[in-house]
């Protein structure tokens, strides 16, 4: 094992470590403050644009989340909107992540966290009076109301053990009844398995998905009110998910074969409804007697409608690159939520009451004055790598190349407020669709996993090199797994990027599984304790591949001191090693944000500092200093 001179920085309970880290961060922030103060107003303007999302409907009316300078759960009845809860009531830098409603419209629940933590509180309240009827602490999700104040929920255990003794990370389903909890599903599931739960649209059945990381799923289902009768309905050794109950059969998506996704019925056997179409099947809902499915074509979404026997009815395409960010059904209708690079949202309500109709119920006008064009770069092995180019109306000489490339996450169009900040400051922005995502199906994802992870880095290098060759100053930007990407790129090709911005990153690939919940990522990255996996991990691990005497691009590394998903030690150690070799590197440590985000004000200030570092670094480069 190689000696790790900065291992002590993993102990963020040590006051000396915290003091050093905060001191380094203060130096970074003070250095950037004159320029950052000029940018923060611009950033806050875009982060305060209201965005409506997560629409659903029950007997009480239309529910949705709203994000502007706060987060809120809202109820709309006959055009009049009522705020049920706002994050301003919940504490400093509170974020409402999700909400849940019962079928009758009497109760709702919401889960919120403070300062970007993954651990927070679930609150159950009455819709009419807003009186709180229950609270649960933890990492809570997937609430399904049963009536009579009873409900299921899933709880993710980050440390210690699950109630059945399995070592964390692990997840279980609980029944909450009168303030008492009973574990009803998941007993004995090994660590690093996740459980998701939802009810069929008619509330008759529970639909359960057990996932081993992002590699394979097992599906369970049964009567909603009788958890002892939930049984395995499908296991195939690949990714899959249940959609709904339709015509007495379970409708599911299987990512077998070429792994683009096909729709099947599960019953006494498996019968195919809609075969693979050569494009990624992202999700589907049942609305009345129709199936509405979202597909991805070159990283943009379109809708395909089928009847319940799988016969095609129609396709719905959009005028510009778009993402279907949310599909939900309430039986006779449903919602399709769209995202764009240039405008925040568009919401369409689908109705099956008289045939099938689509009606726009909410939208925000265009706010980014740029055009979106598409292109391809050729990776080292001949693979064509798609990208979106958000291009200013006037020519630019600076481009930010953003990537992720992992965990089956597709970088489809989305309104990210940092993009117009860069556009207004004279940059173009490129979003690269690298292997490791699912833009081209699960095979595309698998081509960027484990020992094939280097494909992701080479894909990014191909896209960035194309713009570098065209004369652009190239800025590399990535967050989380995308931070790993940028860290790997600057250690593999130190001369490629003119500036690097690495956010909330995973950078030590030999220790990630021992820091916080990192072992949950073993299915994606591999196991550092396995000699075969360790052999390829050490070859690209950014922290282990910083070399003395090499000039790396100016780099800002930003993270949250209390990020409880990706340990801040990844950032601290990488920073210390880069700085120790005399590189221009800046550490920004946020104390009010974590992996789960924070208030728009906190994020706007963080973005302003990151952009200020980039501006400062490019200015020095242009002056030749």
Feature-to-residue mapping (PLM):
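Beta-propeller blade signature
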Residues: 123-126, 169-178, 220-224, 264-266, ...
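Non-catalytic accessory segments flanking enzyme active sites
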Residues: 17-100, 111, 193-224, 230-243, ...
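A flexible loop/linker signature enriched in serine peptidases of the S9 family
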Residues: 66-71, 89-93, 112-121, 136-138, ...
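Cap/lid segment of the alpha/beta-hydrolase catalytic domain
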Residues: 88-97, 116, 362-475, 479-480, ...
């Amino acid at each position: 094992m190689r000696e790790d001179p900065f291992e002590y920085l993993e102990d963020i309970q040590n006051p000396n470590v915290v003091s050093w880290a905060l001191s380094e961060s203060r130096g970074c922030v003070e250095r950037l403050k004159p320029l950052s103060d000029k940018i923060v107003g611009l950033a806050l303007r875009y982060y305060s644009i209201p965005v409506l999302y997560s629409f659903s409907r029950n007997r009480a009316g239309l529910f949705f989340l709203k994000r502007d300078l706060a987060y809120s759960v809202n109820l709309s009845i006959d055009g009049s909107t009522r705020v049920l809860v706002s994050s301003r009531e919940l504490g400093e830098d509170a974020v409402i992540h999700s909400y849940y409603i019962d079928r009758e419209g009497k109760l709702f629940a919401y889960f919120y966290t403070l300062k970007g933590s993954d651990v927070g509180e679930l609150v159950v309240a009455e819709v009419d009076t807003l009186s709180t009827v229950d609270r649960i602490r933890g990492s809570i999700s997937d609430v399904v109301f049963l009536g009579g104040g009873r409900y299921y929920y899933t709880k993710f255990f980050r440390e210690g053990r699950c109630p059945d003794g399995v070592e964390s990370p692990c997840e279980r389903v609980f029944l909450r009844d009168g303030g008492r909890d009973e574990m009803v599903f998941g007993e004995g599931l090994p660590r690093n398995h996740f459980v998701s739960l939802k009810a069929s649209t008619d509330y008759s059945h529970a639909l359960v998905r057990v996932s081993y990381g992002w590699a394979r799923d097992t599906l369970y289902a049964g009567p909603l009110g009788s958890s002892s009768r939930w049984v395995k309905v499908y296991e195939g050794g690949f990714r899959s998910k249940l959609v709904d109950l339709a015509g007495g059969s379970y409708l599911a998506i299987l990512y077998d074969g070429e792994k683009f996704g096909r729709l099947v019925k599960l019953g006494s056997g498996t019968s195919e409804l809609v075969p693979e179409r050569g494009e990624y099947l992202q999700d589907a809902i049942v609305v009345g007697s129709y199936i509405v499915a979202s597909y991805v074509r070159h990283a943009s979404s379109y809708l395909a409608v089928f009847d319940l026997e799988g016969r095609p009815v129609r396709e719905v395409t959009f005028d510009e690159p778009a993402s279907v960010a949310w599909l939900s059904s309430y039986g006779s209708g449903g919602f399709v939520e769209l995202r764009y690079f240039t405008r925040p949202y568009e919401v369409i309500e689908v109705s099956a009451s008289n045939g099938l109709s689509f009606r726009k119920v909410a939208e925000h006008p265009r706010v980014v004055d740029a055009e979106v064009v598409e292109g391809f770069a050729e990776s080292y092995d001949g693979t064509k790598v798609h990208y979106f180019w958000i291009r200013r109306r006037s020519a630019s000489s600076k481009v930010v190349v953003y990537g992720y490339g992992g965990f089956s996450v597709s970088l489809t169009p989305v309104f990210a407020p940092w993009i117009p900040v860069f556009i207004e400051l004279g940059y173009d922005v490129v979003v690269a669709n690298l292997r490791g995502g699912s833009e081209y199906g699960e095979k595309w994802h698998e081509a960027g996993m484990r020992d094939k992870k280097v494909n992701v880095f080479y894909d990014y290098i191909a896209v960035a090199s194309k713009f570098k060759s065209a004369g652009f100053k190239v800025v590399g930007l990535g967050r989380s797994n995308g931070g790993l990407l940028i860290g790997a790129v600057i250690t593999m090709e130190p001369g490629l990027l003119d500036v690097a911005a690495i956010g909330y990153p995973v950078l030590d690939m030999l220790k990630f599984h021992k820091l916080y919940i990192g072992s949950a990522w073993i299915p994606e990255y591999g196991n550092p304790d396995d000699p075969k996996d360790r052999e390829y991990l050490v070859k690209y691990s950014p922290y282990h591949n910083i070399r003395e005497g090499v000039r790396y691009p100016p780099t800002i590394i930003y993270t949250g001191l209390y990020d409880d998903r990706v340990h801040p030690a990844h950032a601290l150690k990488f920073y210390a090693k880069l700085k120790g070799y005399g590189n221009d590197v800046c550490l920004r440590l946020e104390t009010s944000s974590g992996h789960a985000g924070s208030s728009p004000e906190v994020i706007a200030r963080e973005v302003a500092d990151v952009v200020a570092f980039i501006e400062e670094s490019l200015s020095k480069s242009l002056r030749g200093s």
